[in-house]
Every structure is written in C-alpha cells, then in structure tokens.
A protein has these predicted regions:
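The DNA-recognition helices of helix-turn-helix-type DNA-binding domains
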Residues: 33, 114, 123, 136, ...
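Basic, Lys/Arg- and aromatic-enriched nucleic-acid-binding interface segment
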Residues: 1-23, 27, 48, 71-72, ...
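Conserved tyrosine-mediated DNA breakage-rejoining catalytic core shared by Y-recombinases
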Residues: 19, 24, 28-67
C-alpha cells in the first residue's frame, strides 16, 4: 500500500510540474475533469478560486495519467492521496528529495512553481501562463517574472568574454556597381 501511494504521489507531483495544478486540485481531480478529444486537456474548477481552468496536456503529462482503462466520470484520478484523512502525501516527497541528495526541503507547491517558471521562460507570455495557473490577477504571476529577471542576469554573467582579437571588427563598404 505504501508503495502504491508513493507511486501515485510521484505521478501527481510530476503532473503538477506539467500542468501547474495545486495539491488541493490534484486530490479532487476526477476522470470527468479530463477531456480526451480532440486533444487531452484538463478542465477543472479550482478548489481555491472556484474559477475553471483549461489546461492542455503535453504528451508527457498525458502519459502520467493515461492508464488506458475506462473510468467513471466521478472516479478520482489519484484515489490513494485522498483515501483517508491520515494520508500524508508529504512523506514520499521528502523521501525522493533525500534520495536525490537535495538538502533544501520543498513541498507540493514547488511543482506549481516549476510549471510557472518553465512556461514563462519558454514562452515569455505572462498572460497565458497566468490563465493556465488560474491566477485571479496577473500581478500574482508577475512574481515569477521578477525571479526570471534575476535568472537572466545569471545567464548574461555566464557568457564568455571576447578575446582581444575578437573585439575589433573591420567593416568594408560595398563596392559600387
């Protein structure tokens, strides 16, 4: 049973990395929240905001939940995570963190944070990322932009310096015909 919970938590955490879903929404995610056609997509009323989010599923995200079985619309996608009040979904996370040699503790929200950072970095489209996350105000999403700005500084600082012979350029005028 513990191994099954850990595997379910692994799939849920990774799904959050690819969808930005909160833990509360992962726990209440039903098969009825997932549209399979024309493209796999999660259409979910968020627990926190009560707003509906529509999140297209990347192939990697779809593979995490597609078990190729038929499910009732009301059936939970991750039933072990909500089986009882005593289920601690943070234990598997800490176990993985320690096995990976990561000293700094993190929680489930790190997956949502990772999604926000990856999608913003890849697209630069703060409006769409804000909608995917279900933020009620774009200013909430702007917090991630500030983090990306510091990341940009790191990237620029890591660029190699030009050698002296590379610093001068010789421009020639095109010949007149």
């Amino acid at each position: 049973p513990g191994g099954e919970l850990a595997e379910e938590c692994r799939r849920a955490f990774l799904l959050s990395c690819f969808t930005g879903l909160r833990l509360s929404d992962l726990k209440t995610l039903t098969w009825g929240d997932i549209e399979r056609a024309p493209e796999p997509m999660i259409v979910k009323r968020q627990s926190k905001t009560k707003d509906v989010v529509r999140i297209p599923l990347a192939p990697t995200a779809w593979e995490l939940i597609d078990d190729r079985e038929l499910h009732h619309r009301d059936e939970l996608v991750f039933p072990r995570m909500t089986a009882s009040k005593g289920v601690n979904v943070h234990i598997p996370l800490n176990t993985w963190r320690k096995k990976a040699g990561i000293d700094r503790a993190f929680g489930w929200h790190a997956a949502r944070h990772s999604f926000a950072m990856m999608t913003l970095e890849a697209s630069g489209d703060i409006y769409s990322v804000s909608r995917l996350l279900g933020h009620s105000d774009i200013r909430i999403t702007e917090v991630y932009l500030r983090l990306l700005d510091s990341r940009k500084k790191e990237i620029i600082a890591s660029l190699p310096e030009l050698k002296d012979e590379q610093k001068t350029f010789e421009f020639k005028q095109p010949k007149q015909a």
